[in-house]
Structures are given as structure tokens and as C-alpha cells.
Amino acid sequence: MNPVPAQREYFLDSIRAWLMLLGIPFHISLIYSSHTWHVNSAEPSLWLTLFNDFIHSFRMQVFFVISGYFSYMLFLRYPLKKWWKVRVERVGIPMLTAIPLLTLPQFIMLQYVKGKAESWPGLSLYDKYNTLAWELISHLWFLLVLVVMTTLCVWIFKRIRNNLENSDKTNKKFSMVKLSVIFLCLGIGYAVIRRTIFIVYPPILSNGMFNFIVMQTLFYLPFFILGALAFIFPHLKTLFTTPSRGCTLAAALAFVAYLLNQRYGSGDAWMYETESVITMVLGLWMVNVVFSFGHRLLNFQSARVTYFVNASLFIYLVHHPLTLFFGAYITPHITSNWLGFLCGLIFVVGIAIILYEIHLRIPLLKFLFSGKPVVKRENDKAPAR
């Protein structure tokens, strides 16, 4: 096994946590945006729509880069089989726990909120399966994608490690221009694959499991591998943590293009393919923007930050049904969109933190929502004096 850096990457821990927690304002603003969701306010807000689009345009790309970084770090720490087992347990167990405890009750609630409970028995077997796939995976999709990526990277990481043993990694040089060209080509390649599927057999694109396991994995895998490469090559990591005006300007222009595509694109035309190209390069440039910002402001140890780093996954898991409950039963009684948005944040975050504190005191729930076995400290075993 290769040695791993002893110094903790505090800024990456913090960025990953805040990207996770950013899902809360993202989903609450979705209620008040012009995008159609499970629940929506009576009138959409232009500014909350813009805020929602901004978060959606880059958040998960950067998240998967950090996930790839830490995954390769653990890959060097553990034997291959143990690495796969540890990684799959840490994302798979919380996902499987959240389905019966969170997304199933959420699905049942939405059936009645949207008036679809009566029509459920009339659906075909496939429609029931596909509906359950979309609704039960729901916001847990990234955990499923991480399980798939981890399995694929059993082979990919081995190939990377073997290639490194036969080459001098100190001579590897990266530039943002080269990376931009590569990710532009990856975006075009993904768009070609999607368009080909759309032409050959369009119904498969509406299949929930195909979307999560194949299409989402295919799109985010380059970012996951990029994170692993950032761990391997210090020069690449420095490239991301060094502020770049070019990346900031390019990201801003790409976001404008993203908005224009959202506004004028058509789902029956090339809107989704265009979006994949834009968000592929936008995600790359935002890695530099977010990493450099986080490296400058978040690279320190703090008890408060550590608390939210540890709590971020649980809070994210429970926030989604809380958000939908708020949107279905409380939003209609608040006339102001901005007031509703702020009340939603207080409602969801407040209850999520309370639930987090409760679950910490129940060892079984603590294990199920983290995938980590509860380890008793030696002090706990010592008899009281």
C-alpha cells in the first residue's frame, strides 16, 4: 500500500459538506422557481429561479471531483476488496436505509398531495416499477451512482496505479486549456450518445434505473476520475486551488449560455444535448472557482465546521421529504415567495438538525445513516471510579 498524506484536507471536507447542504436551498428554491416540480408556489420568482439554476449548473460536478479525490486516497490505504467494501457500505447502507424510512413515506405523501393515489391501481406493472424507481431513488440518486462508480473504479483505479508504476508522474503537466478541450470533447461525446439513444429507442431515457445507473454515471464519471488524478498529481491539485480569472470569466459565460439554453431550448430538439456540453465544461471551470475559494477561506479546523461536515449527509437525506412537506402544506399559506423561501430554510434545517441529534443517540440509526460501524472508545469500557 502507498502512503497517503497525513495532513487533513480541511477545505475539501468543508466544500463537500457545503455542496451537500446546498441541496437544501436548491430544493426549496425549486418550489418557488419557474421549473415544474412535485410542488410549486402559485407564482414563480425570477430571482429564485436564477438562484436555483446557478446551484444546479455546477454543484454535483464539483461534488464528484471531491468524491473521486477521497476515493482514490482510500484506495491507496486499503486492500482492493476492503476498499470496495468500505466505500460501498458507506454510501449503500445510508441509501438502502433512506428508501423505507424517507423516500417511501415521501412517495405516499405525494400520491395524495398530487391526487394520484386513486389512479395507482390502474397503472401497468412496468409503469408502477418505473414510478417507484424514480420516486424511491429520488434525491438518493448520487449514492447509487457512487456505488456504480466505485465498482467500475475497481478496474479503473487499478489501471491508473499500474500505469503510474511504469511512468514518471513528476513529468505529467496539466493546463486548464488542455483540460477544457478534453471536457468539451467528453461533453460532445455524451451528447452524441444521448442523441443516438433518443433516435434509436427514446423510451429508455424515461426509465429511472437506466437514467441513474447509465446516464448519470456516464456524465459524472469523468469528474470522479479527475478527482482521483488531482490526488495523484500535486500539480493538478495546485491548478485547481490557484485562483484563475480565466476560469471565473469562462464559468460566468458558460452559465449565461446555460440560462439561454434553459430559456430558449426545446426538449424535443437539442436542449439536453446542449446542456450536457455546457455543464461539462462549466463544471470543470467551477472546480477551479470553488476549490480556490475554499482553499483560501475554508482550509482550517473548526468544531462548528466539523459538526456540519459530519452532519451533512444525514441532513441532506432528511431534508428532501421535509422540503416537500413544507411545499405541500405550508407554502400555500405564505403569499411572499422570499418569505416562504426563508421560512422553508428555517423549517427544514431546524427539524433536520433536531433529527440528526436524536439519531446520534440511537446506535442502530447512527450506523444505518452513516454506513460506519459504531466503535466504542476504550474510556467507555473502563469501569467508573
Curated annotation (Swiss-Prot):
Membrane topology category: Multi-pass membrane protein
Annotated compartments: Cell membrane
Involved pathway(s): Glycan metabolism; osmoregulated periplasmic glucan (OPG) biosynthesis
Gene Ontology CC, one term: plasma membrane
Pfam family, one: Acyl_transf_3
Keywords of this entry: Acyltransferase, Cell membrane, Membrane, Transferase, Transmembrane, Transmembrane helix
Main location per the UniProt record: membrane
Any Gene Ontology biological process: glucan biosynthetic process
Alphabetical list of InterPro entries matching this protein: Acyl_transf_3_dom, Glucan_succinyl_AcylTrfase, Glucans_biosynth_C
Annotated transmembrane regions: 17-37, 60-80, 91-111, 137-157, 173-193, 212-232, 239-259, 274-294, 311-331, 338-358
The protein's Enzyme Commission number: 2.1.-.-
GO molecular function, one term: transferase activity, transferring one-carbon groups
Family from the record: Belongs to the acyltransferase 3 family. OpgC subfamily.
Known function: Necessary for the succinyl substitution of periplasmic glucans. Could catalyze the transfer of succinyl residues from the cytoplasmic side of the membrane to the nascent glucan backbones on the periplasmic side of the membrane.
UniProt cross-references to HAMAP family, sorted A to Z: MdoC_OpgC
Designated name of the protein: Glucans biosynthesis protein C
Source organism: Escherichia coli O17:K52:H18 (strain UMN026 / ExPEC)
